[in-house]
Amino acid sequence: LSDHALPEETGPYILVSSTTEAMKKIAAFYRTQLSCKVVGITGSVGKTSTKEMIASVLEQRYKVLKTEGNFNNEIGLPLTIFKIRAKHEVAVLEMGISDFGEMHRLAAMARPDIGVITNIGLCHLENLGTRDGILQAKTEMFDHLQVDGTVILNGDDDKLSTKKEVNGKPVIFYGVGADSAFDIKKDIYATDIENHGLEGMCAKIHTPPVSYTHLRAHETGAYLV
């Protein structure tokens, strides 16, 4: 791709008015040709850690492609999508934004089957104004969720807990502890968190009706649960 004419010795190329826009359109088309499931992850903080943990769990059973580093913007996301091959069963894609409309453009490429939002914090207030503005911008992801898609939200976040339904389907909420300060029921929650410093942490992960599963993670900081 090039937005200007190149010398003949350069070889074949496609002349476009904007290489960035062309790349996004090609990525969106390529996504329609893929059969793998896509997990889209966003949030004010914790995107990359959450992406790494989700990919690590899924890799125990599936062929997974994940966003490398934080290639999560309008250039990094299409480059990641182009790496998906027929062998991949799941793609875990991180999406980062700083203004309105960006998530709309990212999600139009990713078309996630599962959408995960970690939290609504105070990042990029210079463009988004308030936490309600951040909520609005992040949840643009839902406009491009697959028809049978699933939304997973942090039930301990006061803003995200207001989103009880998306496209007429109930949201899956997760959090720490069974009780909620908001009017929701947590579907997945952690209890008995033990922080062992550099040796990692332990917790019980409850997924009713199953009682719980023991979790041991080699991560420092109980907040990562």
Give residue spans per PLM region.
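Acidic, Mg2+-coordinating active-site environments of NTP-dependent enzymes
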Residues: 2, 7-11, 116-216, 222
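Active-site donor-binding loop signature of nucleotide-sugar glycosyltransferases
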Residues: 18, 69, 176
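Phosphate-binding loop of NTP-binding sites
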Residues: 21-155, 159-169
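General small-molecule cofactor/ligand-binding pocket signal
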Residues: 14, 65, 172
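Short, mixed-charge, low-aromatic patches
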Residues: 13-15, 32-38, 92-99, 183-191, ...
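N-terminal leader/targeting and accessory segments in enzymes
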Residues: 1-25
